[in-house]
Amino acid sequence: HDDVRAFTPPPDNVTELAMSPLAKTTLETLLYRGSTAAQLETVLDQIDVDTCDADGENAFFVADLAMVYRQYMRWVRELPQIIPFYAVKCNPEPLVLHLLAALGLGFDCASNGEIQSIIDMGVSPSRIIYANPCKASSFVRRAASQNISLTTFDNIDELYKIKRFHPKCKLVVRILTDDSKSVCQLGIKFGAPLADVPRLLAKARELELDVVGVSFHVGSGCFDPEAYRDALCRSRKAFDMGREHGYTFDFLDIGGGFEHDNFEAIAKVVRSALLDYFPDHEFAPGGSLVPSGLRIIAEPGRFFVYHAFSLATNIIARRVSEPSQDDEDSTRPKAMYYQNDGTYGAFNCILFDHQNVQPKVLSMQRQYVYQAHQHAPGVQQDLWPCSVWGPTCDSMDCILPLTHLPRTLDVGDWLVYENMGAYTLCAV
């Protein structure tokens, strides 16, 4: 992917927010107005697959940044006391990062490269949490040199490392929670069981390190809102353990896992659980710290960008099976389509993020047909079973082992995949 070819901007009233002149200029100069469908058509009009240079017909994204903004407004409406720290690893597209920075979000960074990309935008280090419990020593030293003052840990060796290379850093103990109700489970790799927390806090106290709070992650793509209640119950217990070891925690990171479809249900559970388990704290509006207050952040990623990005791919080859007696069998592919992006690129989300993707026809017989063809008379009757593959020589580079596309779809035509904003661009 050369770049993200086209963007649609936030609504006009985005500039009503308290933005700096630099932020307003960024939004005004880098964005284009119009729908995703219109932008897709505009880009296709500029590509002639018969005459373009090599890579001229590369797959490309179109992003609707208005969707990112609308998701931000949903967050503010449902969870005003929790400031989102966007998970950069989910989608590091610079225009997304600039928009979220202009809206006042913090950033959840898990690597040195992610931290550098945020620092290079002029974002204050105070708006970054280094949310990786197991960091390379060189990365810890680098974080210290960049004044990144907040990070997570879940093991004693990490405490020794931080004591040696970044002793003034404020620490957040990441606890293990039940992530069995999520698409991508993270507990197998990160998170200290509650039984281990006293030992970790005792060692931190011995090393004279400043532990300020607790973090957790219910897993990416959580489909059970009650998972947050359980995690907040465990967090309450960890807070009490902190008090027993001489710490006064004032920071809580409720992680990610927020989904587009059930966000309001999750937010309702989170609000209720916070009142149940942290009734003795005064919540700080917008996540800002107030005297005797609890600063709460979260680490949403896909919530902001999943629906905002569409990916257009070009069909570079097609192989049609010889006619046989099985032609009436709709479960056997009659054709194999090869496109110019696959599981080694943006479609790594199939393998690593368990996403189910479905293509729509963007152009057919060199005519732009997106949306129009979906309900055209006779189109549904002219579909045939087929498979879709990526461009590499690896047989695992399979996008869809079985789907149905129009028989007239041919080499040079284009497909489009909607909802491709999460854990796709980060691989290209």
What annotation goes with each model-predicted range?
Residues H1-K170, A204-E206, D210, E244, ...:
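A charged N-terminal "starter" segment
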Residues D2-P21, T177-S324, L405:
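Active-site loop/helix belt of alpha/beta enzymes
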Residues I47-D50, V269, L275, P279-V428:
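Charged (often Lys/Glu-rich) extended helix/loop segments that serve as interaction or gating elements
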Residues V62-Y69, P94, C109-N112, S137, ...:
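Electropositive phosphate-/nucleotide-binding environments in soluble metabolic enzymes
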Residues Q71-M73, P94-H98, F223-P225, E299, ...:
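Short, solvent-exposed polar/charged micro-motifs at secondary-structure junctions
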Residues V88-E93, A110-E114, P133-K135, D154-E158, ...:
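Active-site beta-loop-alpha junctions enriched in small/polar residues
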Residues L97, I119-D120, V140-S145, I162-F165, ...:
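Short acidic, glycine/serine/threonine-rich loops at helix termini
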Residues G106, I129, L150-T152, V172-R174, ...:
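Structured core elements
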